């Protein structure tokens, strides 16, 4: 048996009446755990190889805690707590970063992102949607939709209310981890699987999808769509949009460089380089025709926005007289042409 793993985590979760997993909570996921940890836990769990999600008992949890006592105190303490659980326990061991094949594996991948152990696009999430059941997220936790009506009636008969916060495949991140050094005004707007860097503020209108996020510090008052990563020091204005890889059929990975500003109700469908500004209300798609202006405001040429992807120090604006989309730079016409040629 190989003693190297891509990831290892001990979790407690929720199953429906058919004992199918609805969700899993991993308090302390590990990325590339030491060979000593793997060697200590594998025999107790009966793990041999590959990517597996193995259920274990309270008795095994005590054994695992004892085995890790002199190797990893934090994991040992966690397992001692898990041994007291009334809910089902699962150990997920990933030998490699392959596409997830179970709900427990999918949840571990999402935890790795939100615990800042990996960045967006750095972990394989292929085929994750069918592995995440659509469940009711309630004040008593995850509930299978087929069991919801009965539980709602049961609560009412006891004079109580079963409150449903959302019906979705993804829970909110803060029910699983709150990364250090962040502010999130409305926690329902940040999904598990988001990477929220230290110093990030997500205001009420901000939204961060899974496999997306921020380097931090930064202010997010707009939408960070799936697959989008925002560089440090960048601000997304109220109601602005970043085009995700899940919508529109595009496969271009949209990113926002460092020190950028996307104005209120603006949007981007191209990757932005460092120190770019997009005027409020202006949505730039890859095919948008852009009048490129030099430092003297003279027209250099008209290009498609995709030709400016990743270029630094650009100001995108709309001409208030004729409606043309313009891009102002601090470069000469010669420098602009050289930059475009190098980019192509």
From Swiss-Prot:
Cellular component annotations (GO), alphabetically ordered: cytoplasm
Regulation: Weakly inhibited by D-2-aminopimelate.
Reactions this protein catalyses: (S)-2,3,4,5-tetrahydrodipicolinate + succinyl-CoA + H2O = (S)-2-succinylamino-6-oxoheptanedioate + CoA
Primary localization: cytoplasm
Binding locations of Mg(2+): 205
Entry annotated with the keyword Magnesium: yes
CDD domains: LbH_THP_succinylT_putative
Enzyme Commission (EC) number: 2.3.1.117
Stored InterPro entries: DapD_gammaproteobac, Hexapep, THDPS_M, THDPS_M_sf, Trimer_LpxA-like_sf, Type2_DapD
Any one GO BP annotation for this protein: diaminopimelate biosynthetic process
Pfam families: Hexapep_2, THDPS_M, THDPS_N
Catalytic center residues: 221
One function term, GO molecular function aspect: magnesium ion binding
Subunit structure: Homotrimer.
Classification via NCBIfam families: DapD_gpp (TIGR03536)
Protein family (similarity comment): Belongs to the type 2 tetrahydrodipicolinate N-succinyltransferase family.
Protein name: 2,3,4,5-tetrahydropyridine-2,6-dicarboxylate N-succinyltransferase
Originating organism: Pseudomonas aeruginosa (strain ATCC 15692 / DSM 22644 / CIP 104116 / JCM 14847 / LMG 12228 / 1C / PRS 101 / PAO1)
Lineage: Bacteria, Pseudomonadati, Pseudomonadota, Gammaproteobacteria, Pseudomonadales
